[in-house]
Amino acid sequence: PAQPFRFPKHPQGPQTRPPI
């Protein structure tokens, strides 16, 4: 299913915000 814009998942787990 189409999901909202999301940053690529990191190896540690899914992340919904950009790396700071």
From Swiss-Prot:
MF annotations from Gene Ontology: nutrient reservoir activity
A Gene Ontology biological process term: defense response to bacterium
Keyword Disulfide bond: yes
Renumbered residue ranges of the record's region Disordered: 1-20
UniProtKB keywords: Antibiotic, Antimicrobial, Disulfide bond, Protein synthesis inhibitor, Seed storage protein, Storage protein
Record's subunit section: The mature protein consists of a small and a large chain linked by disulfide bonds.
Family listed: Belongs to the 2S seed storage albumins family.
Function: The small, basic, water-soluble napins are one of the two major kinds of storage proteins synthesized in the seed during its maturation. Inhibits cell-free protein synthesis. Has antibacterial activity against Gram-negative bacterium P.fluorescens, and the Gram-positive bacteria B.subtilis, B.cereus, B.megaterium and M.phei. No antibacterial activity against the Gram-positive bacterium S.aureus or the Gram-negative bacteria E.coli, E.aerogenes and P.aeruginosa.
UniProt protein name: Antibacterial napin
Species for this entry: Brassica rapa subsp. chinensis (Pak-choi)
